[in-house]
């Protein structure tokens, strides 16, 4: 079974990690679990001010800030995962990655923003 777990460092994605960790053995024998971080692209004007290498390092550093605590938590639970990060629209990129894997299951939080921002901006899961 291939499971995609999009995370963003929010308490909602922490809940999805706890769900995966507590039920990993119920999700099939040796499930393949991929953690996915989707980062919003920097505005074009800002991105033009730095080199492509610097921009890629920035995205890698931002993704690592999200992966590191997730990786540490899942390791303590004995859950092995692969990791991927993509830059773009979260809903679009999650759907693309789910198709590419192909994922049998997507486990993700219902919100990733603060409640107030979610009220005005919506959510990827909406």
Model-derived regions: residue spans:
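Phosphate- and divalent-cation-binding pockets in alpha/beta enzyme and binding domains
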Residues: 15, 93, 115
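Active-site-adjacent beta-strand anchor residues
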Residues: 6, 84, 109
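Structural beta-alpha unit
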Residues: 72-106
């Amino acid at each position: 079974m291939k499971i995609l777990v999009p995370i963003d460092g929010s308490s909602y994605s922490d809940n999805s990690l706890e769900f995966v960790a507590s039920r990993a053995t119920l999700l099939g024998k040796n499930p393949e679990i991929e953690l996915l971080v989707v980062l919003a692209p920097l505005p074009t004007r800002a991105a033009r001010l730095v080199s492509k290498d610097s921009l890629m390092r920035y995205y890698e550093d931002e993704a690592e800030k999200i992966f590191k605590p997730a990786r540490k938590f899942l390791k303590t639970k004995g859950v092995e995962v692969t990791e991927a990060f993509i830059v773009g629209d979260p809903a679009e990129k999650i759907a693309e990655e789910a198709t590419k894997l192909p994922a049998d299951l997507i486990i993700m939080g219902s919100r990733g923003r603060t409640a107030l921002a979610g009220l005005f901006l919506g959510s990827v899961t909406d």
